[in-house]
A protein has these predicted regions:
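Radical SAM enzyme core and accessory elements
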Residues: 2-11, 76-85, 103, 109, ...
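Short helix-capping segments at alpha-helix termini
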Residues: 50-53, 107-112, 271-278, 342, ...
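Conserved beta-strand positions
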Residues: 11, 89, 116, 250-252, ...
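Histidine-centered beta-alpha loop that forms part of the nucleotide-sugar donor binding/catalytic region
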Residues: 14, 92, 117-120, 286, ...
Length: 586
């Protein structure tokens, strides 16, 4: 009886290094990788179609390094035991590129074929006039570089790999695929089990119509909305429910700009109600989403429990400078109150380091947000010229010095000089931002707002634990967090020494014990605070300025009293008066 040949495809989503040079890995990871899910789904479809021929089986292995150790020796043995195979480093961001390079070197030394794709490769090839040095180093190693999206293109790469003839570069940036009927993102249950909350991810669409200068997505996925169908989304959900997975992160950069959002939400609502499944979703939207009729209401009905909002800043000059023209500070409160009414937790992204920012102005603005905007949580980021963004291209063209260490391009490190702050002042302002917003007083305020509006105080407690704890305890951004930090003394940046076992392990266990105590102490205090709020007989009557319904408030709120805010409001009044004049003239 004839036995089929085998091709082993290993998909690896790399992590990156911490400040001490160790790979960031957890017993249970935080956010799931949509790139890994997409590539796995595409590879499964290639396997089903037997694109390598009737006599070749494709075996798949998916590894997210944030929660799974990459054992180069074991994987190499498995690939060489097969008739052919390769490693693909998928969804690699700029901060993950140094780690990816180190992984690639290990596999190439062992004669394994390697390819790499992701936002750093695609972004730099899209925006820079010459090849990025890090990408060129990959190519010099014999690593195949893939730019663009893999739908409809992966099979060609696999067909080249099976005969050992990978091309140095596969560039499909000018051939972005439609998404209707494409292979669906999926990850095996054993991989999802390593993600806290057993959450998986999928993209309902790609592309964003806006032009934010700090964003890389529009220069890789384009500004045209490309969408999956309602049938596709239902199939993704059913496929995951069959694995016992009910929690989803919809990774669209801006779900509100998906032109089919209503059809998708209607289908999710239909499936949810018909099957009686407790589906829950996390989405990302812009600050104008509340202007879409029924958008927020249908999101809540579909099971959206958390909403990430690109707030970015409350200074109109900063927003305009970043080409974030869609953000109107006069819409912020109305939008956030709408999510509050729908009982959906809001998490705002806030960027620190715009040209006019100073440590004092940053703290002032955060206090204004605390008092006047009913947002639940904020996550802070350094303004970073990410490779692939317009900001990076502009600085590159001007010859402005940027930090050469790509590992720092994680939005959690200073990578370029600031006009008003020294590096130390900027870093201090960043720490102050976290400490100011997540003061005990304000955490209690957020809990009271949640209780008064029928929200989930327990969820506020859990997320406050993350956002208040990760920086001081684990020294990583909350979005890179997980449960129980794992370290291997041999998984360190090559230019740093491997620490001796007698020093590494006692220190690791001591640090882990201290961290456990600090986490427990923080959790106990937050639990006490949550119980205090939930047991307050007056909790439903709580009211403050942020929860006050929106009326004509521009004379009263500090949010509108800065010079740039006044200029913005004057401009808005002129526009409204001009529009009224046109109506009267008709």
């Amino acid at each position: 009886m004839k036995t089929n040949k085998s091709f082993l495809l290993v998909l690896i989503k790399p992590s990156h290094y911490d400040n001490d040079g160790y790979v960031i890995r957890w017993w249970r990871g935080g956010l799931p990788s949509n790139s890994l899910a997409c590539l796995y789904g595409i590879a499964m479809e290639c396997r089903e179609r037997r694109i390598l021929g009737a006599d070749f089986d494709i075996d798949l292995e998916a590894i997210d390094e944030t929660n799974w150790k990459v054992s180069v020796e074991d994987l190499t043995r498995s690939i060489k035991a097969a008739d052919a195979g390769m490693v693909m480093l998928v969804g690699v961001q700029s901060n993950q590129f140094p780690r990816s390079l180190d992984i690639a070197k290990q596999f190439r030394r062992r004669g394994v074929q390697v390819a790499i794709g992701g936002f750093h490769v695609s972004g730099t090839l899209s925006m820079l006039p010459e090849c990025d040095p890090a990408v060129q180093e990959m190519m010099d190693l014999g690593v195949s570089v893939f730019a663009g999206e893999a739908e409809g293109q992966l099979e060609g790469v696999l067909q080249d790999a099976v005969v050992g003839k990978l091309k140095p570069l596969y560039n499909f940036l000018g051939d972005l695929p439609h998404l209707e009927g494409q292979p669906l993102p999926i990850i095996p249950r054993e991989q999802i089990a390593r993600v806290a909350g057993h959450t998986t991810s999928f993209d309902a669409g790609r592309g964003c119509p806006f032009q934010c200068s700090f964003c890389t997505i529009i220069n890789v996925q384009g500004r045209k909305s490309r969408r999956r169908t309602a049938d596709d989304i239902e199939a993704v959900i059913r496929g995951n429910v069959a694995q016992g997975i009910y929690a989803f992160f919809i990774t669209d950069d801006n779900f509100a700009r998906n032109k089919d959002w209503e059809a998708l939400l209607d289908r999710i609502i239909e499936v949810r109600e018909k099957e009686q499944w407790g589906l829950s979703f996390t989405i990302q939207v812009d600050t104008l989403c509340h202007k879409l009729p029924n958008f927020i209401e249908k999101c809540a009905k579909a099971g959206v429990r958390r909403c990430f909002i690109g707030l970015e800043n409350i200074n109109p000059d900063s927003l305009l400078g970043a080409k974030k023209r869609q953000n109107k500070i006069t819409d912020y409160r109305e939008m956030m109150l709408a999510w509050k009414q729908a009982k959906v937790m809001t998490v705002g992204g806030y960027i620190l380091g715009f040209p006019n920012d100073t440590p004092a102005s940053i703290v002032h603005d955060i206090k204004v947000i605390q008092d006047e905007l009913p947002i639940d949580l904020l996550e802070f980021f350094f303004l970073t010229p990410l490779p692939g963004s317009e900001d990076h291209k502009t600085l590159y063209a001007k010859g402005v010095a940027m930090d050469p260490d790509l590992n720092k391009y994680d939005l959690d490190h200073v990578t370029v000089e600031h006009s008003n702050m020294s590096k130390a002042e900027w870093e201090c302002a960043y720490k102050l931002a976290w400490d100011t917003y997540y003061s005990w007083r304000h955490i209690e305020t957020v809990m009271r707002r949640s209780a008064a509006t029928g929200g989930n105080v327990g969820k506020i407690k859990t997320y406050a634990l993350y956002f208040k704890g990760y920086h001081p305890i684990e020294h990583v951004h909350p979005l890179e967090g997980g449960v129980l930090r794992l370290k291997d003394r041999h998984e360190r940046r090559p230019h740093l020494p491997v620490e001796p076992a007698w020093l590494f392990y006692p220190r690791y266990f001591a640090q882990t014990s201290v961290k456990a105590v600090r986490w427990a102490t923080l959790a106990i205090r937050l639990e006490w605070l949550a119980r205090k709020v939930k047991s307050d007989p007056q909790r439903l009557k709580y009211m403050d300025q942020a929860l006050t319904p929106v009326v004509n408030e521009v004379e009263n709120l500090e949010l509108y009293k800065t010079r740039s805010s006044q200029a913005f409001l004057d401009q808005r009044r002129h526009i409204e008066e001009a529009q009224k004049s046109k109506v009267v003239a008709r």
